[in-house]
């Protein structure tokens, strides 16, 4: 990293103490809560070191380039881009999210700085943060004299014309580049600057944050309400949330008004109704596009008591996602989208499961809703998702992050590497592991201290101080030592999962508590506390079985708040000797800069469902198969069945070890298990479906999930203005009107021009619709959707395979094989183009 010295590099943080409390008035400043030894502290320390491995110069390059500083002779940044090239992957020329990781990095450094008690690490993190912030300031200053809508701006996407267009009330460029999600990227910069002020006390960050908030107001100031709502149909992160925060910090009502302007009213209105909200409204929607919107809605409701519709929307959204769409790891969605109740088999059959960003944001929303209600259900949800999803997404060896956590039996994780693969979940991953102390304790002022999480830690605040000693969940108890005398209430969570025997003692004296098993609540202890008082809380747990939401063929096992998983392969050769499990070198276990380098479904080696361990018995007898193995390590033995009739090689398991899911890394795992009687399994179509799906997947060279934002953007999607996307019978499609077109670029990695074909997925519901399929502007075939088709599935979908002539895959000079082909579908008949549900390039 190039050394640049700035006068403002050493700024103390006293003002941040009150700044955090401005935004989070019921939370303790992060630097006042310290993690003690345990899984969370270990993850935090690992992450601190991992953050410093990132090349800050390259993370800042997009901002420098867009500000024009790279080309300014005499500037310290002259020639910067050539020396420090921007990261690829999501900084591709055809789909750039440049700048988003830079924003996350500011947040991550600030959080890590506040959370650590290591003086040397704190110094390094602060120096790195100040270094980046002063670059951001220089970039922002470069726009100071601008009069075309860029004053106060700082950003990394190579599309400044979007912003000048919006300011001029011209949406042409935004419509062209909206799928690059420009406001999503800008939100990360806003949030990073906000957090650098809140958690690290940087006055530079505070000034830059105010300026970019002013820009956020300015750039859309000339848009009509209808045009504003149109652009909010594209992913825009939590723009509304950060603007509410600006209102809280600076007291300028313009920011609160702007937050409402940045609020997608379709999503507000779609989740109204106390207990009567639509349970289908979220079906098919891109999940993490939505969660930050509702965080912003809740922030608006916190600052504006009259915003009851925003409050209802946030509450109902959480209820729907937490109660109807959350799976065994505490996450939600498949391949980034919410499923319908009729399509929940995809939790198991789809290889790319819950996205880490979703859970990161659901935890934020849970905190906010808890602050407004002190409802213990939010804390229960937080605990479960934190242990089973967030903690499990860190590679304990390298500190790398995980994008999708597959729920498929025998899946494995794909980890990021520093300075490679700038995925969105790398950004939130950077932040996650410095926030474990954020919600352990909260308060309502000076009267009540809430103990929300059972995490070994200390709290030292002007009003409260205590130490929590525990090895939870490996110990079914926690001890709380009061370190500051005073008259106040301590409220301790009674979790939903706790069994009979929950008890609380103070200095050895048992307290009378009123709790209901299976219902989350708080036990309140009101007294005049003396320094040294000891509270003991007993937290008995039991093993239980939970069904997969709306797909009851599969079950998971939980102990207390912990999901129990099982390895089916060894982590390494030594683990093979210890466990007796076979060792497998996992394909592409570490992601790269390829477009889908984060995807287990694309980059990993998937196995068939029928080759996984099974539980073939009556459901009433499942728990009889499980016995305690090592209670101190939460380990159990489970008797399993191996499907010897599988078309794939099946390891002859008889027993496997259940243990906390987050511990299982660098190996294939089970979290959901097929559980039906032998006779039901024998009549199921699992093996046939496995065989058919595997045959297609093994032949797939490239794949476009049409109608899905990231897949389309990653394949240089180009379509006419009348094109639309949607979902039919739980599958996504894209079509266009008469005369319109849809085009994608597919990559041919085979190096061959022969024996390749195109597979297109359609539905007979579009019978009579006509399209011309072209390759690089050369017609391949005119297709008409029939009323009936061979191999139509039960929902009316079928696959159409079109062989590709070798000449279409050969360069025009005849001397090489094309590495890319443009597949265009044109509505050449008198009807709209038939909806296309995916495009595959297949090898023989």
Q: Predicted segment positions?
A:
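Aromatic (Trp/Tyr) and acidic
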Residues: 20-119, 123, 127, 161-199, ...
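C-terminal beta-rich recognition modules with glycine/proline-rich loops and embedded aromatic residues
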Residues: 314, 380-388, 393, 399-482, ...
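Beta-strand-rich binding/interaction modules
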Residues: 487-506, 756-758
């Amino acid at each position: 990293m190039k050394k640049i010295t700035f006068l403002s590099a050493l700024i103390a943080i006293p003002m941040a103490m009150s700044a955090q409390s401005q935004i989070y008035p019921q939370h303790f400043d992060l630097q006042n809560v310290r993690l003690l030894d345990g899984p969370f502290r270990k993850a935090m320390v690992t992450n601190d070191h991992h953050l410093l491995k990132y090349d800050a110069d390259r993370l800042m390059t997009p901002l420098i380039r867009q500000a024009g500083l790279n080309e300014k002779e005499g500037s310290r940044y002259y020639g910067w881009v050539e020396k420090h090239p921007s990261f690829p992957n999501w900084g591709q020329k055809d789909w750039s999210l440049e700048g988003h990781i830079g924003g996350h990095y500011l947040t991550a450094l600030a959080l890590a700085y506040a959370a650590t008690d290591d003086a040397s690490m704190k110094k390094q993190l602060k120096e790195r943060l100040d270094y980046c912030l002063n670059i951001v300031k220089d970039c922002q200053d470069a726009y100071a004299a601008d009069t075309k809508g860029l004053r106060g701006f700082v950003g990394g996407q190579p599309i400044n014309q979007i912003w000048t267009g919006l300011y001029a009330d011209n949406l042409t460029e935004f419509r062209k580049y909206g799928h690059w999600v420009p406001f999503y990227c800008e939100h990360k910069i806003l949030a990073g600057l906000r957090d650098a002020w809140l958690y690290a006390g940087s006055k530079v960050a505070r000034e830059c944050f105010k300026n970019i908030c002013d820009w956020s107001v300015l750039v859309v100031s000339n848009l009509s309400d209808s045009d504003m709502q149109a652009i909010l149909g594209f992913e825009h992160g939590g723009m509304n949330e950060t603007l509410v925060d600006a209102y809280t910090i600076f007291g300028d009502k313009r920011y609160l008004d702007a937050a409402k302007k940045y609020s997608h009213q379709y999503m507000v209105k779609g989740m109204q109704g106390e207990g009567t909200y639509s349970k289908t409204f979220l079906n098919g929607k891109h999940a993490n596009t939505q969660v930050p919107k509702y965080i912003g809605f809740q922030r608006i409701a916190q600052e504006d008591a009259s915003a009851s519709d925003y409050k209802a929307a946030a509450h109902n959204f959480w209820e729907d996602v937490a109660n109807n769409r959350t799976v065994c790891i505490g996450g939600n969605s498949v391949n980034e989208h919410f499923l319908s109740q009729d399509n929940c088999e995809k939790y198991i059959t789809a290889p790319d499961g819950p996205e880490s960003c979703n859970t990161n944001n659901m935890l934020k929303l849970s905190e906010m809703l808890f602050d407004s209600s002190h409802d213990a259900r939010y804390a229960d949800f937080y605990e479960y998702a934190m242990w089973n999803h967030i903690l499990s997404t860190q590679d304990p060896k390298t500190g790398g992050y995980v994008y999708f956590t597959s729920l498929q039996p025998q899946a494995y994780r794909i980890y990021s590497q520093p300075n490679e693969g700038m995925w969105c979940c790398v950004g939130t991953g950077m932040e996650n592991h410095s926030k474990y102390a954020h919600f352990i304790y909260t308060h309502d002022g000076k009267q009540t201290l809430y103990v929300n999480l059972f995490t070994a830690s200390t709290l030292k605040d002007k009003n409260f101080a205590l130490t929590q000693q525990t090895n939870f969940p490996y110990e079914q108890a926690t001890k709380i030592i009061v370190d500051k005398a005073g008259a106040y209430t301590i409220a301790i969570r009674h979790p939903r999962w706790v069994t009979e025997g929950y008890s609380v003692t103070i200095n050895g004296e048992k307290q009378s508590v009123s709790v209901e098993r299976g219902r989350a609540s708080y036990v309140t202890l009101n007294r005049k506390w003396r320094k040294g008082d000891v509270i003991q809380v007993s937290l008995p747990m039991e093993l239980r079985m939970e069904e997969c939401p709306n797909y009851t063929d599969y079950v998971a096992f939980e102990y207390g708040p912990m999901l129990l998983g099982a390895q089916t392969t060894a982590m390494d050769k030594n683990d093979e000797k210890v466990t007796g499990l076979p060792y497998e070198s996992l394909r592409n276990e570490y992601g790269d800069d390829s477009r889908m380098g984060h995807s287990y479904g694309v980059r990993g080696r998937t196995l068939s469902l029928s080759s996984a361990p099974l539980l073939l018995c009556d459901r009433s007898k499942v728990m009889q198969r499980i016995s305690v193995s090592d209670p101190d390590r939460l380990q159990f033995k489970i008797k399993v069945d191996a499907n010897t009739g599988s078309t794939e090689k099946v390891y002859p398991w008889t027993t496997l070890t259940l243990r906390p899911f987050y511990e299982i890394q660098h190996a294939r795992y089970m979290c959901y298990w097929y559980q039906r009687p032998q006779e039901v399994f024998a009549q199921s179509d699992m093996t046939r479906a496995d065989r058919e799906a595997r045959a297609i997947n093994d032949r797939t060279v490239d794949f476009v999930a049409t109608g899905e934002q990231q897949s389309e953007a990653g394949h240089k999607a180009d379509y006419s203005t009348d094109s639309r996307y949607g979902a039919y019978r739980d599958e996504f499609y894209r079509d266009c009107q008469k005369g319109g077109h849809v085009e994608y670029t597919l990559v041919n990695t085979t190096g061959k021009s022969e024996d390749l074909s195109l597979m297109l997925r359609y539905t007979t519901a579009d019978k009579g619709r006509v399209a011309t399929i072209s390759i690089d502007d050369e017609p391949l075939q005119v297709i008409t959707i029939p009323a009936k088709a061979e191999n139509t599935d039960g929902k009316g979908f079928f696959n159409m395979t079109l062989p590709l002539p070798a000449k279409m895959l050969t360069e025009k000079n005849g001397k090489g094989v094309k590495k890319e082909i443009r597949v265009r579908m044109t509505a050449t008949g008198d009807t709209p183009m038939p909806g296309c549900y995916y495009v595959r390039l297949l090898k023989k």
